[in-house]
């Protein structure tokens, strides 16, 4: 029998469930606090980590020096006629990384907390504090200030739509909000509904001497503040720096108000890919035990010499937990952004990866696929001889051919240099990634670890431990949860076959959705189990493998089910596909792929097919039928090479004109597809594909 990574801790309640299981190392008792820690609140945990770190560098960030604009005119077919469209590209000039020690983080945490209390935000849960901002060092410092005063934080994605933002602000009766200067204009309408907001803090001073973008940043922020004052003259407005200064001057006047374990720490709003955002209620006890669970699976693998690059939304539980894990390891937490990760969108400076040189990087499938395709595009530009050398080295490493370490290091050196040259682990979480993509990164860069969890469980479920590495699974149960599978009869998954819906229980599992008893009753059992909505299976080693989200399993005309996310992860690995939404109509046999094409590789492909000439803009050929059909054939070849068969093979594809971003409403901030919105935009074209295949 193979080594077991989880163990049964009791008997199955009935024939429709598996026995509950835990990580084999916590069979007797799941963790409620991190190893070697006595903390039971986030404030105690932060203080413990920061004191241990002392004068070591603990946090790093870059400032925006300038934003450069480049305009480009493209020609598109609109209603059968050529139309010129002007597009603007932005390029960021960034400062070198600035550092702050762990000791300084203690000072900032306390100064910010005292400043918040001094301006009028009440501690110990009397007031709630809303954060509507992009990931940055100031986001985290505001959060730390709040927990030092026992002020619950409400998080919302910085790309949350107006209705969702109003919903989260009004429902929680938040008294204060922190936002980015660039988001101030988005606050004007919500603040007219959210009457409980009395304090607004913005992340940068509004300085008339700010000449970035020819003064546009200053003017936009100033105009937004003036309009906010018009509609809400009662709101007190401060910059981040002003609040810290107020706190520094109030050391002898304002006391700290540390929270208790059962106190509310955070209401984290989901991104709402289908329904209205739900507020997940998380206590200090929940989050600290969640940090314990995730940390348990990577304990000893990551430490104080590591540098973690942070760029995912901090409103996402996955990112929040891993930033606190970085504090726990006493490594350096460095902030970046998707826009400045590589040299592609920077000017007069290096991208975050090369500048910061991370050893650990956390990402989601959409980001990793973009990185992989950029690498593959560079490889395709090499001479045929160099391409052959690259793929020969790849094949030898994949097959573990002895004595090829030096060769692979030399061949893959440039790829590693492009990501800073020091990565030892990368992690994917939030959505499924294809085995091909996981294998590619693990061979040419470093091992890709898979993590799986939910907001409701503080990102706790599974983390693939480095010494248990295997492709295609989400890994070992973390150290703080108990898991079981239950039958999903209508979809044909049964516990007796070690398959079913995953239910989780333990200290990280929240108890409710904020002011939402109906959703709470649907998702939580009377005895504390959380229904994840994910269909999974136990592997022979006691690890977990995800089949798909229950809501993403669609029955087709012939009565068989297809797993949408599984198909998307495979088709997305094709070099011509930047993103894809697989749509399955229950009245049809096969699905259709709605594809955002990858412009670089597609341009070369179109030239190779003699559909366009070298130097022409691919956007003018997006709707060329011959090009679309050629890409479709390539996608089917990709699918077959990765084991897709029958109804998993698309019957056709349509091309989408623009990239899907949180800003245009086609994906959430966590890069999850908004399927309804995507389908609505190309419904007639999807119907055309079905008609052509009927």
From Swiss-Prot:
What taxonomic classification does the UniProt entry list for its organism?
Answer: Eukaryota, Fungi, Dikarya, Ascomycota, Saccharomycotina
Instruction: Supply one GO CC term from the record.
Output: endoplasmic reticulum
Q: Per the Swiss-Prot or TrEMBL record, what residue ranges does the short sequence motif FACS cover? A: 527-576
Q: Taxonomically, which superkingdom?
A: Eukaryota
**Keyword field contains Magnesium:** yes
Q: Which InterPro entries match?
A: AMP-binding_CS, AMP-dep_synth/lig_dom, ANL_N_sf
- PTM-bearing positions, type N-acetylserine: 2
Chief subcellular location equals membrane
Q: Which GO terms describe its molecular function?
A: ATP binding; long-chain fatty acid-CoA ligase activity; very long-chain fatty acid-CoA ligase activity
Thermal dependence reads:
Optimum temperature is 25 degrees Celsius.
This chain's protein is named Long-chain-fatty-acid--CoA ligase 3
Please give the positions of the paired cysteines in each disulfide bond: none
What subunit structure does UniProt give?
Answer: Interacts with FRK1.
A Gene Ontology biological process in which this protein takes part is: long-chain fatty acid metabolic process
Residues binding ATP = 269-280
């Amino acid at each position: 029998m193979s080594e077991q990574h989880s163990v049964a801790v009791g008997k199955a309640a009935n024939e429709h469930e598996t026995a509950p299981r835990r990580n084999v190392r916590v069979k007797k008792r799941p963790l409620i606090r991190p190893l070697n820690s006595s903390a039971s609140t986030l404030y105690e945990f932060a203080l413990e980590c920061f004191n241990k770190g002392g004068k070591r560098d603990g946090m790093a960030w870059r400032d925006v020096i300038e934003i450069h604009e480049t305009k480009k005119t493209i020609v598109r077919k609109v209603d059968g006629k050529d139309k010129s469209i002007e597009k603007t590209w932005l390029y960021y000039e960034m400062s070198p990384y600035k550092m702050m020690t762990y000791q300084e983080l203690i000072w900032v945490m306390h100064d910010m907390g005292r400043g918040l209390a001094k301006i009028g935000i009440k501690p110990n849960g009397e007031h709630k504090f809303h954060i509507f901002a992009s990931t940055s060092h100031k986001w985290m410092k505001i959060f730390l200030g709040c927990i030092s005063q026992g002020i619950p934080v409400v998080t919302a994605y910085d790309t949350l739509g107006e209705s969702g933002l109003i919903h989260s602000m009004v429902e929680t009766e938040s008294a204060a909000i922190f936002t980015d200067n660039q988001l101030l204009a988005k606050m004007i309408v919500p603040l007219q509904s959210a009457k409980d907001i009395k304090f607004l803090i913005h992340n940068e001073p509004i300085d008339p001497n700010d000449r970035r973008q020819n003064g546009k940043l200053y003017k936009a922020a100033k105009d937004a503040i003036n309009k906010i004052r018009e509609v809400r003259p009662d709101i007190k407005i401060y910059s981040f720096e002003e609040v810290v200064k107020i706190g520094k001057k109030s050391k002898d006047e304002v006391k700290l108000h540390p929270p208790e374990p059962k106190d509310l720490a955070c209401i984290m709003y989901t991104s709402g890919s289908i329904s209205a955002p739900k507020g997940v209620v998380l206590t200090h006890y929940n989050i600290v035990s969640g940090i314990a669970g995730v940390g348990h699976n990577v304990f000893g693998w990551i430490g104080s010499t590591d540098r973690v690059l942070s760029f995912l939304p901090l409103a996402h539980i996955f990112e929040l937990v891993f930033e606190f894990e970085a504090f726990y390891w006493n490594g350096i937490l460095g902030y970046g952004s998707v826009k400045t990760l590589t040299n592609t969108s920077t000017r007069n400076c290096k991208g975050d990866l090369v500048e910061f040189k991370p050893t650990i990087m956390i990402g989601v499938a959409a980001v990793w696929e973009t990185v992989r395709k950029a690498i593959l595009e560079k490889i395709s530009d090499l001479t045929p001889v160099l391409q052959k050398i690259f793929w020969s080295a790849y094949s030898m490493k994949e097959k573990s051919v002895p004595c090829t370490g030096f060769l692979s290091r030399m061949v893959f050196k440039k790829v590693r240099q492009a990501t800073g040259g020091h990565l030892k682990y990368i992690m994917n979480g939030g959505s499924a990634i294809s085995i091909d993509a996981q294998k590619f990164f693990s061979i040419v860069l470093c091992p890709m670890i898979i993590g799986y969890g939910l907001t409701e469980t503080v990102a706790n479920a599974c983390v693939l431990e480095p010494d248990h590495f295997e492709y295609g699974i989400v890994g070992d149960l973390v150290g703080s949860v108990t898991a079981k599978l239950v039958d999903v009869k209508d979809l044909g998954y049964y516990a007796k076959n070690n398959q079913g819906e995953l239910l989780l229980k333990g200290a990280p599992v929240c108890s409710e959705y904020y002011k939402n008893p109906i959703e709470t009753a649907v998702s939580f059992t009377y005895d504390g189990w959380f229904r994840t909505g994910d269909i999974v299976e136990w592997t022979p080693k006691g690890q977990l493998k995800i089949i798909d989200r229950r809501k993403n399993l669609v029955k087709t005309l012939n009565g068989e089910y297809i797993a949408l996310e599984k198909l998307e992860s495979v088709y997305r690995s094709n070099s011509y596909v930047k993103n894809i939404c697989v749509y399955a109509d229950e009245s049809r046999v096969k699905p259709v792929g709605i594809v955002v094409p990858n412009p670089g590789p597609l341009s070369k492909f179109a030239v190779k097919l003699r559909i366009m000439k070298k130097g022409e803009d691919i956007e003018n050929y997006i709707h060329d039928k011959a090009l679309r059909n050629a890409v479709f054939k390539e996608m089917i070849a990709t699918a077959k090479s990765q084991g897709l068969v029958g109804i998993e093979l698309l019957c056709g594809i349509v091309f989408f004109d623009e990239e899907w971003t949180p800003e245009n409403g086609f994906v959430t901030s966590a890069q999850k597809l908004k399927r309804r919105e995507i389908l609505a935009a190309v419904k007639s074209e999807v119907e055309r594909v079905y008609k052509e295949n009927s």
